[in-house]
Amino acid sequence: MPTSTRTKTKSPVTPESIKDLVLLGSPALSPDGSRVAFVHKKIGSKNNYVTNIWMMDSDRGAPVQFTNGSRDGAPAWSPDGHWLAFVSSREQRSPQVYVMPSTGGEARALTDLPEGAITQLKWSPNGTQVAFSFREQADDLTREATRRRKEAGGTTPPLVTEDVFYRLDGDGYFGERRFKLHVASIEDGGHRMVYGKDTMGFFDYDWAPDGRRIVLATNRNKQPLKNPDRTELLVLDVQTGKTTVIPNMPRGTKGRPVFSPNGRWIAYAGRTGKDSSYSTDNLELWLCDSKTGKARCLSGDTDWCLLAATLSDTSEASFEPWIAWSGNDQILARIGWHGEAHVVRFDRQGKKKPRRLTLGRVVLGPGNLSADGKRIVTTLDQPTAPPELHVGRISATSISLKKRTSFNDQFVKTHTIAKPTMNWVRSADGTRVQTWVLKPPTSRGKRHPGIIEVHGGPHAQYGCTFFHEFQVLANAGYVVAYSNPRGSKGYGRDFCAAIRGCWGTVDWEDIHAVSLWLQSKEYVQTKKIGIMGGSYGGYMTNWAIGSTDMFTAAISDRCVSNMVSMGGNSDFPFEPDRYWEGNCWDRPEALWKSSPIRLMGQARTPTLVIHSEGDLRCNIEQGEQIFSALKIQNVPARFVRYPRETSHGMSRNGPPDMRLHRLDEILNWWKRWFKGKSSR
């Protein structure tokens, strides 16, 4: 008889384990609430990501694969539920809009667009058209142009621009091309551009219930980086192309406009005031009359922010707000709070206080509602399991969520998963800093080296998400502490604004306090504490090694080191006297004061510097400055430079082999300085 293969032995979470994870996203609920379409993403056999659309019933049954392409995404239901539109790059073509019967069958290419990028796919309410945002690739950068140059032995041409916004991290170089709004006919696929005046191409839109109009949140100012508060709400007549500005709107940034079912109201996310872009102020929920523009803030009495921005490497941190109507009188929005992300109900008339409809130490992703606003589908993330899809019914007081997928259950069952404990640590001035600790899951009663992880942003949050990197470190025998120092989202406006224009002050006090707290724990080896982080987390790592010798070693990943040079070479250049006082050319004092590079004369901590050649957010010269400063002073340092096809987000969505290499470098560095012989 065959022997049982069941065993109680579980495997540790390793860098290679990322290949076993299934990532889920873009859930779309059918109009009647009976079915769910979603994107299934997994690492493929050719060092790639394979993304398909899957389908399942809302209440029962297993999900099934719905599309066969390897790069399918953005599913959108037709209003009658008979069709599914999606974006695909199949058959070696550039991305196109496809439609397919929702019962299955052959997908039909609805568009024949030139090479470019497609986002924001939405059906018209009458089901005769789909709208989408499209940006055409610059002529010299298309695949065909590249092929012809290669055959002719030509050189890659220079990029010439007169616009300061000509590139975007993770998106590459696009020169002066911008996203524009298009509509396509479902009957014959004919498509046309209906709006193209947003200066940066960052508009949001929604169809009016009558199917003839579209509302756009758009900035047409000639200097949008300098004037982000000039965002308007426009109503576009789709047939004639005529636009009408909704009058009397408060000045400030606006985004994610959503018509009420009766078309009378528009809910949107916004901030008021001139300085309302990269802001520490809360992003609020606003409501306006669609004709008169009379507006009021519905979330002003709370200290919530509509930017949940909870970080993870197994789900995309959403820096965009999510807003939806549930009937004509109730609005749902997602807020981040204390490391969690929840759905909140707001009353249109403002007579009832906002009410949180979901509970638990979880992070809910952007949801999608049925046509009647009574059902919702969303991803649910928690610290001990990767995100899965949940479907729920919405009542006046709560949302009852039911787990509907189990793609990662086997992974959780067969691997040793570290479970975090949550703590509040007192900083030097008494401020409480929320902190989580992961201990090695299979080694109890022993002391272990400790690692401080610092998040990026800085205006984001760590929290109740599954973090593969953290699990790898805990399974390798390290205690991992991750916290939300001042500057983080999720703790109110004042907490977030505490480091506005003054990084390296109270934020460092908080990180230092957490480090000392971890060092004092009975399960940590007192003299073996490390620090690491990416982006702003890399900044704080640099600041730490320039401020103290308490850390055994450090890892500075995709860092910021010099605010003066960063102000001019990032994809979003710093505007003078906005977030930072002064500027980066003739009044750099505040920027220099907050630059860790000026502290490197005191640094003695062995440091691994990780950076990507294609990082357009924090240019690779930021990492170069730290590495050079350390090596010139004979401080042990190692520099890992990833190729140009990687970007600032490599640890989350970079080429799989590069992600594995990065994690191996991290493990080897900690092993070298924690467990090996060092000269220190």
Predicted regions and their residues:
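Short, solvent-exposed loop/turn segments at conserved positions within beta-propeller repeat blades
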Residues: 46-50, 90-95, 141, 172-178, ...
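Conserved beta-propeller blade repeats
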Residues: 21-36, 69-87, 107, 114-130, ...
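Predominantly five- to eight-bladed beta-propeller fold
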Residues: 2-7, 51, 135-187, 227-232, ...
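Cap/lid segment of the alpha/beta-hydrolase catalytic domain
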Residues: 221-222, 405-527, 534, 566-574, ...
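Beta-propeller fold detector
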Residues: 64-67, 108-111, 192-195, 244-247, ...
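Beta-strand-rich domains and repeat architectures in extracellular enzymes and scaffolds
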Residues: 16-51, 176
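Short loop/turn segments that connect beta-strands within beta-propeller blades
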Residues: 57-61, 101-105, 185-189, 237-241, ...
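Active-site-proximal cap/loop segments of hydrolase catalytic domains
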Residues: 482-680
